[in-house]
Amino acid sequence: METSAKLKFSRLSPQKARLVADQVRGLPVEKALEILEFSPKKAAAIVRKVLDSAVANAEHNDGADIDALRVARIFVDEGPMLKRIRPRAKGRANRILKRTSHITVTVAEQQ
């Protein structure tokens, strides 16, 4: 049984979020949570919250055994960009793109 959780419009660059997502893909949930807890990256705390939510969904909705869960799929999609302007010399301006992410975590019981 697979259960998932999504976080949309997270103010985090998809490139940075994917670095953390790649570290926990395919691991047992317990080990993945340990890795995320001790990672110094901002993305680790955000991904950890989504993983906790997926585990809670599996336990509450499907009655899954938490000890038997693993991270079946985790992927980060790009969300809409917030466009900001940085003033430059001589009346010019540069555009700054504040990127957002959609993070999806799917957990499943190990076979």
UniProtKB/Swiss-Prot annotation:
GO terms of molecular function: rRNA binding; structural constituent of ribosome
What is the protein's given name? Large ribosomal subunit protein uL22
Keywords tagged on the record: Ribonucleoprotein, Ribosomal protein, RNA-binding, rRNA-binding
Q: Domain of life here?
A: Bacteria
Question: Alphabetically, which GO biological process terms does the record hold?
Answer: translation
| Family named by the database record | Belongs to the universal ribosomal protein uL22 family.
What is the annotated role of this protein in its UniProt record?
This protein binds specifically to 23S rRNA; its binding is stimulated by other ribosomal proteins, e.g. L4, L17, and L20. It is important during the early stages of 50S assembly. It makes multiple contacts with different domains of the 23S rRNA in the assembled 50S subunit and ribosome. The globular domain of the protein is located near the polypeptide exit tunnel on the outside of the subunit, while an extended beta-hairpin is found that lines the wall of the exit tunnel in the center of the 70S ribosome.
Q: Spell out the subunit comment.
A: Part of the 50S ribosomal subunit.
Q: Name one Pfam family in it.
A: Ribosomal_L22
For this protein, the record's HAMAP family field holds: Ribosomal_uL22_B
Which GO cellular component terms are attached? cytosolic large ribosomal subunit
